[in-house]
């Protein structure tokens, strides 16, 4: 009794908000984590987890502060930190709920003979695309799936179509992969919501028996998606879809898996329209080239109108959607890029001075074949 002993009365309390803030700074960084989705792949006839999912954890600091306060003024016992567990959307322990059961479509393309830079970009893009999951009734975006095309991801400089000409830029060759995805989605009968054909016919896309008109160009001039030319398709089902892709040094393969849609696809093409004659050869002077340089930077080719028609029916035979895929391939001429000292000396100039014959060469064109 303070009155009897002559002491001042007092009470002891904790500032709970301040305690919660202190505990958050002390413990949260070591406990909190976001959930991580499983990375999945296809193993013969079912989905498997390639990288396991991880539950999310969030420390409840307000509740922890209350428990610490109770312990401090009570039994002084240990306190178990309360936390909320958040499950990932793609849970390794429940892959069946995704509803992916069937191969819907396969696309392929051949890039054998590509220069090293182009082959590198194809293989990097195929690896980034592999394992992409498309939610029910969502839209697949090729460029969102592979992300920003830059050196940090392993992309290098290679030949690209830039406007009305062919030049070099980082990521040249990535269209080989977007073309292959397009073919898989086309054959699967999926609704294609964004598609851009190439300006010129590219021989790689017509290897292995593929006809012209089944290629897909992409463009990513900036990190702003509003500037992109993308390839997109829709998942029309109530289940998830999986895009699987790989490149083996010669070919790109893309498989699209999902629920069995029962679609029947009718494809009619190619239907050829007008032809456009090759353009005259052209010489371009590049002051950045080393002296004595003459490089052919574009090969001549005719222009051609090409159209494919696709009709997709449901399992009852009712028409779901139909579309024509029209491409106008522009003609091109041989383009020779030369250093300033070689101006006028490329094959684009028919009046160029030819080098003299060696002194010991017969001038009648004779000699030994072989």
Outline where the language-model segments fall:
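Well-ordered beta-sheet/strand-loop patches within structured domains
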Residues: 1-370
